């Protein structure tokens, strides 16, 4: 009888641990929309090194921070900024934020996160925004 109770308790504990881990690490996919560019950032950098857009076309950047608030460098926040277009969006820990802008001049521009991880000088915390016209 004790063996059955022990087995049942073990199964419940393992099941609850699995549920906890699933909730802690599962990140549902973001919905897709027209002219919305999804960018994810974590302590390892951005998931996109280069983004192509068209001049004169309104674009929305949806930035998602994959880091939690327990990170000591930046507190889990991440930024996506392009100085030339005055774009600056900051996503909270494990959250999203959006910025909409219309690039007016063709060229290649730097986007960056200057909140953590060595800031914009870290090669993984910046990338290229290519505006084609």
For each predicted feature, which ranges?
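N-terminal edge beta-strand
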Residues: 29-59
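Short structured motifs
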Residues: 45-49, 83-86, 96-98
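Extracellular/periplasmic metallocenter environments
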Residues: 3-31, 91-133
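Generic detection of short hydrophobic beta-strand segments and adjacent strand-loop junctions
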Residues: 37-39, 51, 87-89, 99-101, ...
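Histidine- and aromatic-enriched segments that form or immediately flank copper-ligand environments
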Residues: 66-93, 119-123
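A mature extracytoplasmic/lumenal domain signature
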Residues: 43, 57, 65-67, 84-86, ...
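Exposed beta-strand and adjacent loop surfaces of beta-rich binding modules
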Residues: 58, 77-79, 108
């Amino acid at each position: 009888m004790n063996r059955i109770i022990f087995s049942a308790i073990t199964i419940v504990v393992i099941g609850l641990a699995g549920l906890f881990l699933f909730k802690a690490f599962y990140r549902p996919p973001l919905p897709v929309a027209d002219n919305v560019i999804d960018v994810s950032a974590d302590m390892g950098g951005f998931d996109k090194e280069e983004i192509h857009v068209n001049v004169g076309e309104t674009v929305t950047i949806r930035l998602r921070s994959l880091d939690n608030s327990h990170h000591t460098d930046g507190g889990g926040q991440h930024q996506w900024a392009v100085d030339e277009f005055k774009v600056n969006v900051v996503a909270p820990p494990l959250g999203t934020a959006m910025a909409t802008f219309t690039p007016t001049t063709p060229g290649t521009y730097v986007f960056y996160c200057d909140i953590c991880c060595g800031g914009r000088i870290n090669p993984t915390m910046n990338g290229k925004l290519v505006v084609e016209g």
